[in-house]
UniProtKB/Swiss-Prot annotation:
Name of the protein in question: Elongation factor 4
Top EC group: hydrolase
Top-level taxon of origin: Bacteria
Enzyme Commission number(s) of this protein: 3.6.5.n1
Family to which this protein belongs: Belongs to the TRAFAC class translation factor GTPase superfamily. Classic translation factor GTPase family. LepA subfamily.
HAMAP family with a match to the protein in the record: LepA
Gene expressing this chain: lepA
Length: 607
């Protein structure tokens, strides 16, 4: 293409994404848009088409972002090229959303006509506003009996401050209002800025590993043009490659000769090493590089850590490969090797949140067929020692000796919880139980309230979300952001089995709840660990002080079975002999800890 053709094509491109709270109908709307623009034949169409991972379909949530190029003939008779970038709605995957938004000029904000605005809706809108996107509100599910589009329209204006007078009333399920949405995209979303003659700048917003073609980078071209055969350079790592193919997703991968300004597509360049394409990096030409890289994304720091160990220790290297491949298209995952006396060799992994942790675990078990043991999740603590040094602890077993600790600080989050009036009491009770500090309470309208609390991250990590949902019948929605570290009275609790410490069961707990926690865990382990031939004491200790103890009674053989009647001294002799053997056994015996026991420590608050 020459310069004029490229400029004309550029003026017809519209890049947009769809943002919404979980379950407000984002993926269904994406399906309808694909149908409307005839991107697929009826035969290829299936529900939640862009959720390509089995896991996404099963849980009905979007985890990864996805990009598609569509052609749309508008009412003004012109052909437009639309790039739809689908985004997840769950709080753990906010980084996926911020990556999608950085590649767009506009966003469709989907709000459920019955539920109204929820916490994640707001969080994602603020992300979109930070990226200066044109936001088009769409009120979805208007065919529900409980829908109240006018109230929701008012809410969008009051809470977010967007003009909702032209908001499209739609039902993605019934296919109502889809054309109006497409027309609004064409009219209101600006065409991409940028110059096809400038030095090349492409932003990598995702990547995948293909065993035959190497690493495939998903890119958005900001300036310049990239063709097959070009020599390109990754600006963060400085590595150079020759482009072997470029193309777009129509959801299938379709090869093209070149990608130019505003295009969203993929680029392969026989990149073998997973670490060479970092998400957020800029690709430029090796001969005529751009002066500076694009502003990427903030690198998201993991907030929750846990140990992953293969049940079969021979599969340690397979687990490393699995984690490396997942890290490639999940830039927020971090891991490093660690060893545990109880569990052998494994990895300490960092995640954004509990859902993220569960999903990664499940993907490893499914896609790579590796059975895992996971240890209790923990957060990063800052420990200040009496000698003036400070250390960072992400694994309870690395906690320094209590005598040498001056103070411990833990991360706090600011949690905003949107909840119907009737459940305010229940939510406040949960937050107080989790050591939360009340900050603020605002009424959105007559029926809904936003509560703001400061809560330690370690309390949210366990099962805060589950408790919140179950005590509000699923109506509460929740969003959190890290606000920093504050000192807390924290202690490390160790579990001793048969007087030996099991490092994988250690955890860090607030001093006030240490006794209760210890008591519950000891009782729980007593139920889960099978009886042995000798008696096994289970102790919960803080430093050298035992705070809770329970004993698993020994199984014993009836050694008197052969003595009919018989002399008491004969019986005594047999019983004493048995006692001696048990004692000897106890000093050399070791106790196997079943996988359920590790899980029990996580699911502490069930009772």
């Amino acid at each position: 293409m020459n310069k004029e053709e490229r400029a004309k094509r550029q003026s017809k491109i519209r890049n947009f994404s769809i943002i919404a709270h979980i379950d407000h109908g984002k993926s269904t709307l994406a399906d309808r848009i694909l149908e409307k623009t005839n991107a697929l034949t009826q035969r290829e169409m299936k529900a939640q088409l862009l959720d390509s991972m089995d896991l996404e379909r099963e849980r009905g949530i979007t985890i990864k972002l996805n990009a598609v190029q569509l052609n749309y003939k508008a009412k003004d008779g012109e052909e437009y090229i639309l790039h739809l970038i689908d985004t997840p709605g769950h709080v753990d995957f906010t980084y996926e959303v911020s990556r999608s938004l950085a590649a767009c000029e506009g966003a469709i904000l989907v709000v459920d006509a019955a539920q109204g605005i929820e916490a994640q809706t707001l969080a994602n809108v603020y992300l979109a506003l930070d990226n200066n996107l044109e936001i088009l509100p769409v009120i979805n599910k208007i065919d529900l009996p409980s829908a109240d589009p006018e109230r929701v329209r008012q809410e969008v204006e009051d809470v977010i401050g967007l003009d909702a007078s032209e908001a499209v009333l739609a039902s993605a399920k019934a296919g109502i209002g889809i054309e109006e949405i497409l027309e609004q995209i064409v009219e209101k979303v600006p065409a991409p800025a940028g110059d096809s003659e400038e030095p090349l700048q492409c932003m990598i917003f995702d990547s995948l590993y293909d065993p035959y073609r190497g690493v495939i980078a998903y890119i958005r071209v900001v300036n310049g043009t990239v063709k097959v055969g070009d020599k390109v350079r990754m600006m963060a790592t400085g590595k150079e490659f020759e482009v072997t193919e470029v193309g777009v997703f129509t959801p299938k991968t379709t090869q093209r000769d070149e990608l130019t300004v505003g295009d969203v597509g993929f680029l392969a360049a026989s990149i073998k090493n997973v670490g060479d394409t970092r998400v957020g990096d800029t690709i430029t030409h090796a001969k005529r590089p751009a002066a500076e890289p694009l502003a990427g994304y903030r690198k998201l720091n993991p907030m929750v850590f846990c140990g992953l160990y293969p049940i079969d220790s021979a599969r340690y290297n397979d687990l490393r490969d699995a984690l490396e491949k997942l890290e490639l298209n999940d830039s927020a995952l971090e891991f490093e090797p660690e060893t545990s006396q109880a569990l052998g060799f494994g990895f300490r992994c960092g995640f954004l949140g509990l859902l993220h942790m569960e999903i990664i675990q499940e993907r490893i078990e499914r896609e790579f067929k590796i059975d895992l043991i996971t240890t209790a999740p923990s957060v990063i603590y800052k420990v200040y020692l009496t000698n003036g040094e400070d250390v960072i602890v992400d694994n309870p077993s690395n906690m320094p000796d209590p005598q040498s600790i001056d103070r411990v600080e833990e991360p706090f989050v600011k949690a905003s919880i949107m909840v119907p009036n009737d459940y305010v009491g229940a939510v406040m009770e949960i937050c107080q139980g989790k050591r939360g500090t009340f900050i603020d309470m605002q009424y959105l309208d007559e029926t809904r309230v936003t509560l703001t609390y400061e809560i330690p991250l370690s309390e949210i990590v366990y099962d805060f979300f589950d408790q919140l949902k179950s005590n509000t019948k699923g109506y509460a929605s929740f969003d959190y952001e890290l606000i920093g570290y504050k000192p807390s009275k924290l202690v490390k609790m160790d579990i001793l089995l048969n007087n030996e410490q099991v490092d994988a069961l250690s955890f860090i707990v607030h001093r006030d709840s240490a006794y209760d926690r210890g008591k519950v865990i000891v009782e729980k382990l007593k139920e889960l660990i099978p009886r042995q031939q000798f008696e096994v004491p289970i102790q919960a200790t803080i430093g050298n002080k035992v705070v809770a103890r329970s004993t698993i009674k020994a199984m014993r053989k009836n050694v008197l079975a052969k003595c009919y009647g018989g002399d008491i001294s004969r019986k005594r002799k047999l019983l004493d002999k048995q006692k001696e053997s048990k004692k000897r056994m106890k000093s050399v015996g070791s106790v196997e800890v079943p996988q359920e026991a590790f899980m029990a420590v996580l699911k502490m608050d069930d009772n």
